[in-house]
Regions:
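Short hydrophobic/aromatic beta-strand micro-patches
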Residues: 55, 190-192
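Conserved small/polar residues in nucleotide/adenosyl-binding loops
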Residues: 209
């Protein structure tokens, strides 16, 4: 029978010190990463990613195959397709990239711009291409935080191994992981900062929204 040694107070203290050291290392790594992001104000850019739900006339999610047809329809000569495991899952050009989230949410990632006005112009140009194509397939996009029409379990995952693995993991871990993957859409904004105080000020301002 193995010799089982009871943990002592000294062992517990050592364990706590190791945990604190790891915690401190993580904090230092985060601070170092944020400091590397300091930029001069004349180099400031702003970036944005917008995720959309794509619905048909019955308020059902379009799904990968229909959105695939739309993507092929709107791709121009200068657009470069992005394939993964033989499946088209997006395309990109100098102004933006188009990709699909786990349950076929359509995402546009606009290249960093000097002003919000530039971002708006690029997004409007994209919608002028996208919306007519959607209409031809009796589809539309909506910008909700959560799918208001369907449960997460009803929504299929696109053919991407990483999402399949994530989906399996979330079936066993936590309670809302699959809901996050399949039934949510978001807007993500990236803002440059010059120093720690500038970063704090902008972060607090963003929290107001």
């Amino acid at each position: 029978m193995p010799n089982m040694k009871k943990a002592t107070a000294s062992d517990n203290i050592v364990g706590m010190r190791i945990d604190m050291d790891i915690y401190r290392m993580n904090i230092d790594a985060i601070v170092s990463h944020l400091k590397r992001g300091f930029k001069r104000s004349d180099d400031f850019k702003i970036g944005i990613e917008i995720e959309h739900f794509v619905f048909d006339s019955n308020d059902r999610s379009a799904g990968y195959e229909k959105i695939l047809d739309v993507m092929k329809d709107i791709m121009g000569e200068d657009d470069k397709p992005y394939y993964l495991e033989g499946h088209l899952i997006g395309f990109y050009n100098d102004r933006y990239s188009i990709s699909l989230e786990p349950a076929s949410q359509l995402e546009i990632s606009i290249a960093p711009c000097a002003s919000a006005d530039e971002l708006v112009c690029i997004y409007r140009d994209f919608r002028r291409i996208l919306d007519p194509a959607l209409s031809r397939y009796n589809l539309r996009v909506e910008c909700y935080g959560y799918n208001p029409y369907e449960s997460a379990q009803e929504l299929d995952i696109i053919p991407k191994k990483r999402y399949e693995y994530m989906d399996r993991y979330f079936q066993k871990a936590g309670t809302r992981g699959r809901n996050m993957m399949r039934a949510t859409a978001s807007v993500q904004v990236s803002v440059d900062y010059s120093d720690e105080n500038d970063a704090i000020r902008k972060y607090r301002l963003c929290l107001l929204y």
